[in-house]
Curated annotation (Swiss-Prot):
Subunit structure of this chain's protein: Heptamer of 7 subunits arranged in a ring. Interacts with the chaperonin GroEL.
Organism: Shewanella frigidimarina (strain NCIMB 400)
Function, in words: Together with the chaperonin GroEL, plays an essential role in assisting protein folding. The GroEL-GroES system forms a nano-cage that allows encapsulation of the non-native substrate proteins and provides a physical environment optimized to promote and accelerate protein folding. GroES binds to the apical surface of the GroEL ring, thereby capping the opening of the GroEL channel.
Protein name: Co-chaperonin GroES
Gene Ontology biological-process annotations: chaperone cofactor-dependent protein refolding
Membrane-spanning ranges: none
Superkingdom of this protein's organism: Bacteria
Family affiliation: Belongs to the GroES chaperonin family.
Subcellular location: Cytoplasm
Length: 96
């Protein structure tokens, strides 16, 4: 995948969510939840402060994160794969 996010943005591949209920019933359509976990594929250089310094991001390629799929999230298809372009502010936690 040849993509480089700018500034405080990251490229995330959504991880699959378990599609069975606790009772073993396979969930489909709207009953199946979209995962809010993903793997970081690429990271921008960092946030640019008011005085022009660049602050590196707190995440790195390979991290598994929990994200908020809000207003600023951009869905794209890159090399046939759906990825999300998020700002670091949309990331809520690093898992593990």
């Amino acid at each position: 995948m040849n993509i480089r996010p700018l500034h405080d943005r990251v490229i995330v591949k959504r991880l699959e969510v378990e599609s069975k209920s606790a009772g073993g019933i396979v969930l489909t359509g709207s009953a199946a939840e979209k995962s809010t976990r993903g793997k970081i594929l690429a990271v921008g250089n960092g946030r640019i402060s008011e005085n022009g310094t660049v602050t590196p991001l707190d995440v790195k390629v390979g991290d598994v994160v929990i994200f908020n799929e809000g207003y600023g999230v951009k869905k794209e298809k890159i090399d046939g794969e759906e990825v999300l372009i998020l700002s670091e502010a949309d990331l809520m936690a690093v898992v593990g």
